[in-house]
Amino acid sequence: MRQKLEEIKNSAINELKTTLSKDQLEAIRVKYLGKKGELTQILRGMGALSQEERPIVGKVANEVRSYIEETIKEAFSDIKNKEKSIRLENETIDITMPGKKQAVGKRHPLDLTLESMKDIFISMGFTIEEGPEVELDKYNFEALNIPKNHPARGEQDTFYINDNLVLRTQTSPIQIRTMENQKPPIKMIAPGKVYRSDSVDATHSPIFYQMEGLVVDKGITFSDLKGTLELFAKRMFGNKVKTKFRPHHFPFTEPSAEMDATCFVCNGEGCKVCKGSGWIELLGCGMVHPQVLRNCNIDPEVYSGFAFGFGVDRMVMMKYGIDDIRLLYESDMRFLNQF
């Protein structure tokens, strides 16, 4: 039995010396150490040995098994290292070749339009003011002369956090905060995100950008409002653009108006976009309501002012001819790469 074990050991050593691959190593392991391997068969037959022979043969068998296992392990490591060396030699890198460029992003059309609008108003002497997106009812509705029973206060239009807190539905609250904290003269714009309880479709989104403006000083008239907005329209869309004002109603301005501009698709000749009228609604505006001034501790007998507001998303869509607002929020590089 001991002689047989020595023969198995020597046979395994000779085979391992000529082994060149992992598959060959695995075949040798199975031949000698597998369930039906030669060494395994001997170990299973030890029950037939005498009590004196059993520990002696068992010791030799375990030594042979350990030796074969260790030799296979070392051979496997050697083959692995050789394969790695060959792979590294074949995978040489030409460091003189140019690397792959990272994809370059594009500025979002909303960002481009917001920046253009800000630059125009800053050049006209306006400052930029900011405020919280989670707003008190007082600033979002009450101080703006919007009564408790106004439809805009309904849950179908407004996201309520609790009875006293809402996600701002407009950036007008920033105007109120500015009038509370600053003394006239005031000349500011308030760009930012606003929230409405709208279903998503081609022209509506529950989140969009708005920019509102406010001027308060002594002797401010509707002519000042008209001149400011006409100048903005020409700088934004070119000198050929025409504008007109239509009477309207807003709780926080009196008198109120909406300003239309010649259609950017048909240049005022009439098309599907402007529904054949040649005009597109651009923004809402008006003279600040006396009660709004009083709510901010500004005497309407001494000061007057005008306010205006427009959806930035709408401006983007008109400027670039985009017909679906959802494109502005989908982060689709095929769309964004066009700007």
Swiss-Prot record:
Catalysed transformations (reactions): tRNA(Phe) + L-phenylalanine + ATP = L-phenylalanyl-tRNA(Phe) + AMP + diphosphate + H(+)
Essential cofactor(s): Mg(2+)
Enzyme type, top EC level: ligase
A GO term for molecular function: catalytic activity, acting on a protein
EC numbers, comma separated: 6.1.1.20
Residues reported in the UniProt entry to bind Mg(2+): E254
GO BP annotation list: phenylalanyl-tRNA aminoacylation
Keywords of this entry: Aminoacyl-tRNA synthetase, ATP-binding, Cytoplasm, Ligase, Magnesium, Metal-binding, Nucleotide-binding, Protein biosynthesis
Major location (coarse): cytoplasm
Cofactor: binding comment: Binds 2 magnesium ions per tetramer.
Subcellular location: Cytoplasm
The keyword Protein transport is assigned to this record: no
PROSITE patterns: AA_TRNA_LIGASE_II
GO cellular component: a single term: cytoplasm
Bilayer-spanning residue ranges: none
Pfam family, any one: Phe_tRNA-synt_N
UniProt superkingdom: Bacteria
Self-association state and partner proteins as the record states: Tetramer of two alpha and two beta subunits.
PANTHER family registered for this protein in UniProt: PHENYLALANINE--TRNA LIGASE, MITOCHONDRIAL, PHENYLALANYL-TRNA SYNTHETASE
Family according to the record: Belongs to the class-II aminoacyl-tRNA synthetase family. Phe-tRNA synthetase alpha subunit type 1 subfamily.
Protein name (record): Phenylalanine--tRNA ligase alpha subunit
Lineage: Bacteria, Bacillati, Bacillota, Clostridia, Eubacteriales
